[in-house]
């Protein structure tokens, strides 16, 4: 079980033994970002990818050692949108940061991140998007809330609604269906 404990400016990404509750490892970088940590295998290394207060990080799943980090400072203090893992790439978004896809890579013994694409046509605040068959679907906070779809491979905007749809949305995939529930329950 892995999650970020603590609060603003003070926290640690922490792994706990599921049977005993004892701490297995703890990475003390900057404070938590309130997004759910994701497990990814990148370049053969099992790692935990998460958003912190000021970065997106990849730490080794077995011991919590920092592998890579990428600056990620949004207008809001709660980076709460869970990163999307697509193969060995990471797709991220934050309040007024647009959306970016990047690729962590290991060159020799050193990790780095390379931007694949970025767009500022949509951006998210509290609503995590969903990846469905190569399409990223979600709720942008721009234009007072608009649903959108992006080509996850290129970052091209496929469509956007007019706006004024909702403040936030829960986007859920169930088989071939997407459910987009707004904050009014519609």
Where are the model-predicted features located?
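Noncatalytic, solvent-exposed loop/strand surfaces
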Residues: 1-186
């Amino acid at each position: 079980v892995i999650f970020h404990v603590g609060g603003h400016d003070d926290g640690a990404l922490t792994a706990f033994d599921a049977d005993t509750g004892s701490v297995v490892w703890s990475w003390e970088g900057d404070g938590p970002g309130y997004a759910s940590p994701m497990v990814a295998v990148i370049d053969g290394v099992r790692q935990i990818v998460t958003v912190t207060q000021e970065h997106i990080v990849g730490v080794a799943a077995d011991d919590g050692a920092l592998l890579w980090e990428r600056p990620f400072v949004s207008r809001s203090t709660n980076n709460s949108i869970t990163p999307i893992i697509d193969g060995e790439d990471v797709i991220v978004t934050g309040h007024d940061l647009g959306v970016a896809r990047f690729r962590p890579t290991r060159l020799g013994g050193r990790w780095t991140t390379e931007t694949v694409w970025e767009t500022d046509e949509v951006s998210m605040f509290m609503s995590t998007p969903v990846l469905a068959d190569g399409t990223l679907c979600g709720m942008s906070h721009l234009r007072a809330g608009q649903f959108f779809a992006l080509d996850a491979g290129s970052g091209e905007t496929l469509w956007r609604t007019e706006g004024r749809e909702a403040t936030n949305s829960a986007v859920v995939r169930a088989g071939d269906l997407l459910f987009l529930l707004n904050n009014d329950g519609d």
